[in-house]
Amino acid sequence: MAQAYWQCYPWLVLLCACAWSYPGPESLGREDVRDCSTNPPRLPVTAVNTTMRLAALRQQMEKSNLSAYIIPDTDAHMSEYIGKHDERRAWISGFTGSAGTAVVTKKKAAVWTDSRYWTQAERQMDCNWELHKEVSISSIVAWILAEVPDGENVGFDPFLFSVGSWENYDQELQDSNRHLLSITTNLVDVAWGSERPPVPSQPIYALPKEFTGSTWQEKVSAIRSYMQNHTMAPTGVLLSALDETAWLFNLRSSDIPYNPFFYSYTLLTDSSIRLFVNKSRFSLETLQYLNTNCTLPMCVQLEDYSQIRDGVKAYASGNVKILIGISYTTYGVYDVIPKEKLVTETYSPVMLIKAVKNSKEQALLKASHVRDAVAVIQYLVWLEKNVPKGTVDEFSGAEHIDQLRRNENFSSGPSFETISASGLNAALAHYSPTKELHRKLSLDEMYLVDSGGQYWDGTTDITRTVHWGTPTAFQKEAYTRVLMGNIDLSRLVFPAATSGRVVEAFARRALWEVGLNYGHGTGHGIGNFLCVHEWPVGFQYNNMAMAKGMFTSIEPGYYQDGEFGIRLEDVALVVEAKTKYPGTYLTFELVSFVPYDRNLIDVSLLSPEQLQYLNRYYQTIRENIGPELQRRQLLEEFAWLERHTEPLSASAPHTTSLASMWVASALAILSWSC
């Protein structure tokens, strides 16, 4: 899944309009977006009336002596996905996009979001709200300074601001004679009142031993060893990100959409383990698993989730040093630790250690990708049979592939909202259809599906782009060059400890050669039944260096404005490369096992090395997936796999019509049944 760090190109406004209402922006109509210039304003049926909500919030602001209140789009753990009861910005503004910041003053209210969501915001917000399209903190503060008089207060919830965000706001407001005030009671929650969704209370459970790479005791020992060997000699480490605690204790639940996490903090010290969580969610068996009935160094002491600030403050009053990873620590807990007792790093030791999978974790992740490939292949076969009938749309397609994954062993649902995008909608890297707004899949258009699953043994993420008709020469070239980029990076051999950003350009080279590019990241880490976007692995400037045992996605793409989109994403394991001469070098081993669309590959563009690599990959797919399909008696899917992994030849381009594929499939099945 391409991560959301697109540049804010103006053309995305038009693309958003297209995505919301096919066939194009001309059909969008003024009734589908708000028009605040008329009296009374004209609002679409999708707009949310926020008048009473704003009045309730402003009442709380007045009680706290605030002239402005900042409402970000995250939770107290800096999570990528947030639970319903944490959707504060969405509730107060009506705007449900995944990225954006709201600010409410005594008289005005405004939302800042990037170009992916401009049209959505105009559809969902009423005229109580201004929409701002420059999303920097500097832009937000400039607006605040224009609206808030000298000497007045700007409030924020310290548990919703990372340390870095707080520092940026504080710096921008310095010398402005406006005061940034930390209010630990969230005012939106108070205004929301009884209508706010409850905090999840599903059981927190321990993963069966066969699905874990190490015991929680072994992991605790590894973190303590890290602290002992640290030059700053920290006595404790504070874990704030939800996947950190889930990984450390091999515990899972379902508090967060698409992520098997539960609300918690961990304060791990050299002599104690303190888990801040809702204690009532543990069974007796899980309590015994955590050794909660003792106070020894390998016993877990359970404390109430809401007491994290007081608990950290009390521990920090002693002769201690606390290590934090500032990327996922909020100002709410950072603020109570005296600066002389802080040891700060970008990422916590848990983030660094879990990024490198041990041999058992590697085997588990690989196994999950085999089953996942079966589900994706079943989906592609289903599409080939049903798209010509005109019965498949983007939304029904997304529902079908999600269900195919749920049918697999050890499934725990999708790992993110499936991106099912046809034609011009695929030009939006993060487009997802809805039951109300979607397009039919067509033989005459490209179709992109980016999807993934959560399984007890691993998390998956894969993207394939297909065309069932006759693609244009440009579409074939663009697709092939995206494939070339995927191959070039996947087969690369590079020195150990190389940063991902150093090699990232290999995925773009084939596109750059002809003046093409893509605006999202090239890859991200992936977890063992954890995050689909697992930091700090990847190809960005702030990712850690590549190391043997890491898993990363490799996902170049190309997006033609208003016409089509292409992305080819595989998950790869970083392994030691076999080189002619001695040295420690690394390369990638793909663990995604679904063939690319032969109908879109221009073999003449591939170098001999690229073609050889592709055919070798296809042979690997046959070896890993073929037996599984045969074991399950999925004969139609097996025939499809055999056809789509036939070796490609430089002398003869391979394109196969739907009709010929159906005939071949029927003959293959008939021959097996005779």
Curated annotation (Swiss-Prot):
Its cofactor is Zn(2+). Expressed strongly in lung, liver and heart, and at lower levels in kidney, testis, brain, spleen and skeletal muscle. Belongs to the peptidase M24B family. This is Xaa-Pro aminopeptidase 2. A lipid is attached at A650 (GPI-anchor amidated alanine). PANTHER family: XAA-PRO AMINOPEPTIDASE 1 (PTHR43763), XAA-PRO AMINOPEPTIDASE 2 (PTHR43763:SF4). It is a lipid-anchor; GPI-anchor. Keywords: Aminopeptidase, Cell membrane, Glycoprotein, GPI-anchor, Hydrolase, Lipoprotein, Membrane, Metal-binding, Protease, Signal, Zinc.
